[in-house]
Amino acid sequence: MIRMSENVKGNLSISQIATGQENNFTISIYGEKGALHWSQENPNYARFSKIGKADQIITRGGAIQNKNSYASIRIPPGHPEGYLEGFAQIYSDAADIILNRKDKNELLELLPGGDSGLQIMKFITASVNSSNNNSIWTDLSSI
């Protein structure tokens, strides 16, 4: 039990080895009128539970923000944290090959090339064709 300002009581539970938890950092705040829950394993959402009302899901980048909250948002809503880091890793691997004059075949599996781009374009074309033809199966080899 913890006691905060204005005699507010709380409960703090900390564990690095709790059964069924991986690296879950969770904050739950309970009050007389409701509760607020957030988990770092699902960081784009917070759940607001008001007594006698349906739960509300609050999204990162959603409409319930104040102007100061935008300062900590680096990516648009719907993009997961780590999105930018994924691209940064590709650039880092490419720079490593170029700057250190490594054998390009050594890290080639990590880097997308023209063939990867062609496969993606075929997939997009097949998806559009399928959609335009009543969702029929479209083989990528036919594109």
Name each region found by the language model.
Residues 1-24, 28, 115:
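Rossmann-like dinucleotide-binding domain that binds NAD(P)(H)
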Residues 1-6, 33-111:
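C-terminal glycine/acidic-rich active-site capping loop/insertion
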Residues 13, 39-40, 140-141:
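Short linear motifs in exposed loops
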Residues 129-143:
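C-terminal capping/lid region of NAD(P)-dependent oxidoreductase domains
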Residues 94, 117, 134:
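Hydrophobic, well-ordered secondary-structure elements that form the walls
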